[in-house]
Amino acid sequence: MKLKKSFLNHCKKKNLEINPNQLELVDHLNKFYNLNFNKSFLKKIFYNKNTKPGFYLQGAVGVGKTMILNFFYENFKFSKQRIHFNEFMISFHNFKFKNKKNKKENIIEQFVKKLKKNYELIYFDEFQVTNIVDAMILGNLFKKIFNENIKVLFSSNIKINDLYKDGLQRDQFLPFIKILKDKCFQEKLIIEEDYRKSQSDKNKRFFYPLDSTTNFKVNKFYRQITK
């Protein structure tokens, strides 16, 4: 997947500002794709013990994390599902209710096998855990999901260690946190401004230090004053 080139073209067509931190994230997503889906790449490395089936992106509101993960998702050509986490858990509980009489196999295993049959990638946008019922089963559920080698994208405002913080019986939730940390590449997107509430840099007199971020701001400033 030549994600970076496609992303640059996408930003150019949409007249979107390109931030170096966002470009770095695109590179990490491209690596995630190559490690998990690029067969020619996999043949070259044969086996990479650093390969992980999950990608957890944390960042504040408005930094563009959803835009970038959505772009990755739209360019992903295999079977996939984008779903809100609460909706996903409702689908699990509905499945559990409908299949409660089936004692031949564990309900979680049945549910995950169904996922495996339909999807190679699942994308949870704005992931968070607030429900104690969900919190208590996530460890077993995602252990099965990752064991089936289903790839998972997470977008969240919350870092992994702070998920379900101060929640009831949180000690029983901690195995899920360990699973996420073991099975996911962890990235944090840091942007100084909220693109949905961006303010002009016209009042700035100088930019420092001289790095890629500063270069981005100077280019943005130039575009603003030459409109």
Region roles according to the model:
Residues 62:
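Walker A (P-loop) phosphate-binding loop of P-loop NTPases
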Residues 65:
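Conserved lysine of the Walker
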Residues 68, 72:
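Hydrophobic positions on the alpha1 helix immediately C-terminal to the Walker A/P-loop
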Residues 15-46:
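N-terminal pre-Walker A segment at the start of P-loop NTPase domains
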Residues 115-132:
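Conserved P-loop NTPase "ATPase switch" module shared by AAA+ and STAND
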Residues 48-57, 120:
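Pre-Walker A (Motif I) flank of P-loop NTPase domains
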Residues 75-106, 110, 114:
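AAA+/P-loop NTPase substrate/partner-engagement loops
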